[in-house]
Amino acid sequence: MAIAVGQAAPEFALKDQSMKEVKLSDFKGKKNVVLVFYPLDWSPVCTNEHACFVNDMKQFETLDAEVLGVSVDSAWSHKAYAEKMGIKYPLLADFQPRGAMAEKYGVFLADKGITGRAIAIVNKAGNIAWFKQYDIPVVPDLKEVASALAQVKAASA
């Protein structure tokens, strides 16, 4: 079952592509967090999605947000993928146990062994402020995400 707006966001501690541990609590009280759940590195739709985030990163930074990508790929896969794609934001490895974080957020597709496509915005208080799941072949509308993030930022001002 997917998470609900208003509930506390489940904590996590995962390695990024630099092998650095990233915890949700690192951002509490400091930044809003945009969790970008995606199925797999290197797939065409995921590559398009990340290209959109890379191109729009300034907008997300001005909205006081940290973008974190999350998939079941290893940190090593994330490292190669981020270098090839020019991704500067953290890509978190929900690798072992496979999909454990995605499971907490209700977006792990156990029958496929991958993370579903979804975006969650966690506000500075650590609560789910916005959440949307997408069909696997759909690239999320980043204007919609940015609009939701602007509302979250305004609500915390």
Where do the protein language model's features map onto the residues?
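Chalcogenol-based redox active-site neighborhoods
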Residues: M1-A157
